[in-house]
Amino acid sequence: KFANIASFARIGATDHPLDRASLHHFQYRSASYWDDAEDDAAWFAQRRARRAQIGHDTWIGHAAQVKPEVSIGHGAVVAAGAVVTKDVAPYTIVAGVPAAPIRRRLPEALADRLLALGWWDWDHARLRAALDDFRTLSVAAFLDKHGG
């Protein structure tokens, strides 16, 4: 919930079969090449099963890529153009190719309190009631007021 995903970001971007004699898609999109051939259903099932996980309140920048089977923690930021090949811890900012941690978005104690609060599970009315606090309070003051 509340994930911010910029234009041209790719999440769970597909890979090619590195363990086969050819990388080309004629071997798994075979029906596009021959009338008597079928697509490789097992290959597509394997690709669908390799999903990326995106946490709550994340920001994935323009043209970033999040590879399959990678987890982006709650509150994390993926910089524009980054290629994420490993899990990103909650409230961590990553950048580069391959993506590497740049710094924590928030001090660990505040991040832990936000994780415990889980405001992203609040209903619409509670979010609206806290809107001014989201806009004006520091993270620490917000947590003090809202029980995190």
What are these regions (language model features)?
Residues 73-74, 89-91:
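Conserved catalytic segment of ABC-fold P-loop ATPases
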Residues 1-70:
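Flexible, glycine/small-residue-enriched loop-and-beta-strand segment within the central core
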Residues 117-123:
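C-terminal boundary and immediately downstream tail of ABC-type ATPase nucleotide-binding domains
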Residues 73, 77-79, 83:
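A generic "structured core" feature
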Residues 99-100:
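A short acidic/histidine/glycine-rich donor-binding loop in glycosyltransferase catalytic cores
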Residues 134-148:
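C-terminal amphipathic helix plus adjacent low-complexity
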